[in-house]
């Protein structure tokens, strides 16, 4: 709790600073003259007249396949807004949008190989990943925690010592857990699962004592599942997760175009409507998320 209070205090301070910048910008009458955007990813999109977006259909409510067979979700909807603005930003008359399905491993390959221009799921922005990929403005913040069985005498993080823990492979939570165990910060046996569904089955069958993962992903994919009535989540979070849209590092101007659309969207009621659509039944946006949107709504 102290950690999140510190973050909140810093963001509120940043809010005050940003408000001052916005007011100053509003008083400025300087013309905004921009050169045409260019770069390798932008050129690829222009040449193909197509924006290719990767998404993981197993990361609801951030990315999933809807009943109509089309991609949907909180991050997917943000990327649809980005796509709608790219036509104008790149001065194109026509641009198709192509969606490809990926998973927790192939999403990185899709961006690195150039098969996809954007990755729109629930990808965490970390310092390690920034060495290989570029990330947009932060789109969501949440904490990682543990899901346990209702009948288990496990109430807090300390109770997980010497227990068997499941985690979805190729995720930041998996990496964090491996580091914590290797450094001696946590004593536990880690078992990797291919998905939250597989991890949920392990927990139900008592093959593991808990599942580690991002809180909202676990709530949506485990607690809401047919096995969900048998599980609960611990109240404590052990790590923050900062989600963002992932893309190639080779094109800073493409990243700027994505960020410009996100920042402008954060100024409007649209972002609140998206939040309510995908998370309204789970929780209301707290001060942390409100500050996140406010501090990234940069002036022109």
Regions found by a protein language model. Name each.
Residues 27-42, 77-85, 151-154, 158-164, ...:
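Extended ligand-binding regions for polar small-molecule ligands
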Residues 28-119:
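Extracytoplasmic small-molecule ligand-binding "clamshell" domains
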Residues 28-36, 175-191, 229-231, 262-300:
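Ligand-binding clefts/hinges and TM-proximal coupling segments of bilobed small-molecule sensing domains
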Residues 38, 92-109, 152, 190-202, ...:
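Short helix-initiation/N-cap motifs at beta->coil->alpha
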Residues 55-61, 71-88, 124, 142-196, ...:
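Bilobed "Venus flytrap"/periplasmic-binding protein-like clamshell domains
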Residues 57, 140-151, 215, 223-263, ...:
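Periplasmic-binding protein-like
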Residues 80, 84, 91-159, 298-300:
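Acidic, polar ligand-binding/catalytic clefts
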Residues 106, 120-132, 176-183, 204-239:
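A ligand-binding cleft/hinge motif common to bilobed small-molecule-binding domains
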């Amino acid at each position: 709790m102290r950690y999140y209070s510190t973050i909140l205090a810093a963001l509120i301070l940043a809010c005050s600073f940003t408000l001052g910048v916005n007011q100053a910008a509003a008083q400025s009458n300087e013309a905004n003259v921009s050169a045409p955007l260019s770069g390798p990813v932008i050129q690829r999109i222009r040449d193909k007249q197509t924006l290719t977006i990767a998404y993981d259909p197993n990361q609801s409510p951030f990315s999933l396949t809807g009943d109509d067979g089309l991609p949907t979700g909180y991050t997917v909807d943000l990327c649809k807004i980005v796509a709608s603005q790219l036509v104008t930003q790149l001065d194109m008359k026509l641009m198709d949008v192509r969606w490809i399905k990926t998973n927790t491993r192939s999403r990185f390959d899709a961006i690195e190989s150039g098969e996809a221009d954007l990755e729109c799921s629930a990808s965490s922005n970390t310092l390690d990943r920034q060495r290989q990929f570029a990330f947009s403005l932060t789109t969501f913040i949440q904490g990682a925690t543990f899901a346990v069985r209702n009948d288990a005498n496990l109430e807090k993080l300390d109770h997980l010592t010497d227990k068997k823990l499941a985690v979805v492979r190729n995720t930041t939570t998996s990496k964090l857990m491996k580091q914590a165990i290797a450094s001696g910060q946590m004593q536990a046996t880690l078992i990797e699962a291919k998905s939250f569904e597989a991890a949920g089955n392990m927990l139900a069958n008592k093959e593991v004592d808990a599942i580690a993962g991002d809180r909202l992903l676990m709530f949506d994919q485990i607690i809401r599942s047919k096995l969900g009535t048998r599980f609960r989540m611990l109240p404590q979070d052990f790590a923050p997760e900062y989600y963002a849209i992932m893309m190639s590092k080779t094109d800073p101007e493409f990243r700027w175009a994505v960020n410009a659309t996100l920042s402008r969207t954060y100024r409007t009621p649209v972002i609140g409507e998206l939040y309510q659509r995908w998370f309204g039944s789970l929780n209301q946006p707290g001060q942390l998320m409100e500050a996140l949107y406010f501090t990234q709504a940069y002036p022109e």
